[in-house]
């Protein structure tokens, strides 16, 4: 049934809506009604179809020509602000009506002719429209000389703001609806009822994930550790930017009080009481039977020169003797300190009292198993078996070839006959040692 009360204002408006994820403007016929015995103050609108609705005095068209009816209760309005930054149809100006439920973006050819009556009906007794509409007409009233207020209190000292809760998933879960008082403390945000001083909910600043304000709505995202649980909370207020500024200042002050949160120095590592020793003292360890701890071999220091040294046996030998290498050095006429070594795996011999040169007293040398430059003996820790006849022929052929090359080199360089005699004795010695064969031993 059509309303019989006359509207305060009617005409064509454009309302923004989202269709398939795209913002578009819809042309509507709007009627602005004042509150009275027959109804509340409201703004009604219909979609314009088939030529649209005529003026208020000529509304004889039937209901078939009207689209969906939309009603905005002016008693639920929080703010009515111009929206200059929004793109709107040609030759129109946009304005935003924010209510407790949602926001409505409208556009009209004469924006101020709609904003003024809406503000007078939505905010009765104020004598002027909400912030923005009065500022739009202030230049037309002329310049008024003003003086600075020396006792002006900045907005940072204001900590209480009247707000209206916007409907979100988090506010619905917490059963928040209607007007409240938002109190901004030094450490948290508190929401109180207008008639009770007790706080309904509190959100510490350190538990807020995000916060901000847009189009007269202050919102923040609470974390899991808040009393209300995580979620988005939105509050409508004409001073939403001021609320956001107070929150930002409080967070900055809290960060200054806790400098370790902004920049925490790295924790130093514990300082060592003493440097590690290069040669740690001996330790007593329990080992399994048959296991030998690796120990550095002490090698003797001898003069370089052509010589054949006795075999080096382990002083703690329990099984077969380890295979050793006898080294033969060749002394050159120019470089007396450089030795070229030839190696032969001689045999495995048992301990003999005749080996006095290789005793433990004569085997003191640098630790680590490395032989010095003048030492012609290299110890082999592995247990090597005596080579077979095929290996003997290969070794003999290799050594003979090496000796022939050495003799040729010595002859070309004009070496003395004494050195050639030493080479011949060396061949005889190696042949005799090979014919002796390995000492008999019993292997498991």
UniProtKB/Swiss-Prot annotation:
Predominantly expressed in bone marrow, spleen and lung. Low levels in heart, brain, liver, muscle, thymus, kidney and testis. Highly expressed in B-cells and macrophages. Residues 358-376 have a biased composition (Low complexity). The modification Phosphoserine is found at residues 138, 274, 308, 314, 371. It is found in: Cytoplasm; Cell membrane. Gene3D superfamilies: Pleckstrin-homology domain (PH domain)/Phosphotyrosine-binding domain (PTB). The modification Phosphotyrosine is found at residue 325. Constitutively tyrosine-phosphorylated. InterPro entries: Docking_Protein_DOK, Dok1/2/3_PTB, IRS_PTB, PH-like_dom_sf, PH_domain. GO terms for cellular component: cytoplasm; plasma membrane. CDD domains: PH_DOK1_2_3 (cd14676), PTB_DOK1_DOK2_DOK3 (cd01203). It is a peripheral membrane protein. Residues 278-299, 354-390 are annotated as: Disordered. Residues 7-123 form the PH domain. Changing residue 399 to F: No effect on the reduction of BCR-induced IL2 secretion, nor on the interaction with the SH2 domain of INPP5D or CSK nor on BCR-triggered tyrosine phosphorylation. Keywords: Cell membrane, Cytoplasm, Membrane, Phosphoprotein. Overexpression of DOK3 inhibits the transforming activity of v-ABL, the ABL oncogene. DOK proteins are enzymatically inert adaptor or scaffolding proteins. They provide a docking platform for the assembly of multimolecular signaling complexes. DOK3 is a negative regulator of JNK signaling in B-cells through interaction with INPP5D/SHIP1. May modulate ABL1 function. Belongs to the DOK family. Type A subfamily. PTB domain mediates receptor interaction. This is Docking protein 3.
């Amino acid at each position: 049934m059509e309303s019989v009360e006359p509207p305060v204002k009617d005409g064509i408006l454009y309302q923004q809506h989202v269709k398939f994820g795209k913002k578009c403007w819809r042309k509507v016929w709007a009627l602005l009604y004042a509150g009275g015995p027959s109804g509340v103050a409201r703004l009604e609108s219909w979609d314009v179809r088939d030529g649209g609705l005529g003026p208020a005095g000529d509304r004889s068209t039937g209901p078939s020509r009207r689209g969906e009816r939309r009603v905005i209760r002016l008693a639920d309005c929080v703010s009515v602000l111009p929206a200059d930054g929004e793109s709107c149809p040609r030759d129109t100006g946009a304005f935003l009506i924010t209510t407790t439920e949602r926001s409505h973006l409208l556009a009209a050819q004469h924006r101020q002719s709609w904003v003024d009556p809406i503000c007078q009906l939505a905010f009765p007794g104020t004598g002027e429209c909400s912030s923005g509409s009065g500022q739009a007409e202030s230049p037309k009233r002329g310049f008024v000389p003003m003086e600075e207020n020396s006792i002006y209190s900045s907005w940072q000292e204001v900590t209480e703001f009247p707000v209206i809760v916007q409907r979100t998933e988090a506010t619905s879960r917490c059963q928040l609806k209607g007007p409240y008082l938002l109190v901004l403390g030094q450490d948290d945000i508190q929401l109180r009822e207008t008639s009770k001083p007790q706080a309904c909910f509190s959100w510490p600043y350190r538990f807020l994930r995000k916060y901000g304000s847009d189009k007269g709505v202050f919102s923040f995202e609470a974390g899991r550790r808040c009393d209300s649980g995580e979620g988005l909370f939105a509050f409508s207020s004409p001073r939403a930017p001021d609320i956001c500024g107070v929150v930002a200042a409080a967070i900055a002050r809290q960060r200054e009080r806790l400098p370790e949160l902004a920049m925490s120095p790295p924790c130093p590592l514990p300082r060592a009481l003493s440097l590690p020793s290069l040669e740690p003292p001996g330790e007593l360890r329990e080992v399994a039977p048959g296991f030998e701890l690796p120990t550095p071999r002490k090698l003797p220091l001898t003069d370089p020169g052509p010589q054949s040294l006795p075999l080096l046996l382990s002083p703690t030998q329990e099984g077969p003797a380890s295979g050793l290498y006898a080294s033969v050095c060749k002394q050159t006429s120019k470089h007396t300190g450089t030795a070229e070594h030839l190696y032969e795996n001689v045999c495995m011999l048992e301990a003999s009292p005749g080996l006095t040169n290789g005793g433990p007293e004569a085997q003191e040398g640098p630790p680590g198993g490395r032989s010095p430059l003048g030492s012609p003996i290299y110890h082999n820790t592995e247990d090597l078996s005596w080579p077979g006849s095929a290996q003997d022929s290969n070794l003999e052929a290799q050594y003979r070839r090496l000796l022939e090359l050495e003799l040729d080199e010595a002859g070309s360089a004009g070496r003395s006959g004494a050195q050639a005699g030493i080479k011949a004795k060396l061949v005889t010695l190696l042949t005799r040692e090979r014919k002796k064969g390995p000492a008999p031993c019993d292997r498991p």
